[in-house]
A protein has these predicted regions:
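An alpha-helical, amphipathic repeat domain used for nucleic-acid recognition
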Residues: 1-192
Length: 192
C-alpha cells in the first residue's frame, strides 16, 4: 500500500474520509477525498469521533498524518525486532535512514515515542541486546573483553552498562583465558 502525504499548509481543499477499513492487527486504513490513504491505530481514529460525512479540520488532518507516520515507524521497528535484537541507537539510525523524506511530521520525536513504548512493553531492551551481542561474539568469534566493549559502545550501549554485561560473563581469569585462546588461534593461523 502506498501512503502519500501532503503538506497541510498547501492543502486548501476540504478533505473528507471516503472509506474506513479496519484490520485485524488493530489498525484502520482511511481513504481520504484527496486520494491519500492513511493507516493508523484504530484507537486514534475512534478517539477523534469523526463522522465520515463531515470534513476533517486542519488539526484532525495533522493528527491523522502524525499517527499514520507513527504507525509506519512502529511497524518498521517491530519488523526489525522480529529478526533480531537491536539497540535503541541502531533502531534510531535505521528508521531515520528510511523515513528521512517525510516532511509532514517530526520523525525523530515519533521514533523516540515509539522506542519508549517498545521499551515499556519490553519489546526492545538495550540490556538484552548487550547480553545477546556479547554471547554471540564469545561463541562465534575470538573476541576479547575490550573489542566487545568497544563494539557495544558503537551500538549505543553505555560503557557502564557494557562493562556490567561483560562482568556477568566472566571475571578477569575468564577474560585472560579468552585472550590466551585468541593468541593460540592467531599463532595457528599464521603458521599455516
Amino acid at each position: 500500500m502506498e501512503l502519500r502525504f501532503l503538506k497541510l499548509s498547501d492543502s486548501q481543499n476540504i478533505v473528507n474520509v471516503e472509506s474506513v477499513h479496519y484490520s485485524n492487527d488493530g489498525t484502520v486504513t482511511l481513504k481520504l477525498s484527496d486520494k491519500r490513504k492513511l493507516k493508523l491505530a484504530a484507537e486514534v481514529w475512534s478517539g477523534l469521533e469523526q463522522p465520515r460525512d463531515n470534513p476533517l479540520t486542519d488539526s484532525q488532518q495533522e493528527i491523522l498524518e502524525r499517527e499514520a507516520c507513527y504507525t509506519m515507524i512502529q511497524n518498521k521497528i517491530l519488523s526489525f525486532l522480529a529478526v533480531r535484537e537491536h539497540s535503541a541507537q541502531e533502531l534510531r539510525r535505521k528508521i531515520k535512514q528510511r523515513f528521512y523524506k517525510i516532511a509532514t511530521c517530526d520523525v525523530s520525536a515519533l521514533v523516540e515515542r515509539c522506542l519508549q513504548e517498545m521499551q515499556e512493553h519490553d519489546f526492545q531492551s538495550d540490556e538484552r541486546f548487550a547480553r545477546l551481542f556479547t554471547e554471540s561474539k564469545l561463541s562465534n568469534k575470538p573476541y576479547g573483553h575490550f573489542k566487545i566493549l568497544q563494539d557495544l559502545q558503537k551500538h549505543g550501549i553505555s560503557r557502564e552498562q557494557a562493562q556490567a554485561v561483560l562482568n556477568e560473563f566472566g571475571n578477569q581469569g575468564f577474560w585472560l583465558k579468552k585472550a590466551v585462546d585468541c593468541l593460540v588461534l592467531l599463532q595457528k593461523n599464521t603458521n599455516h
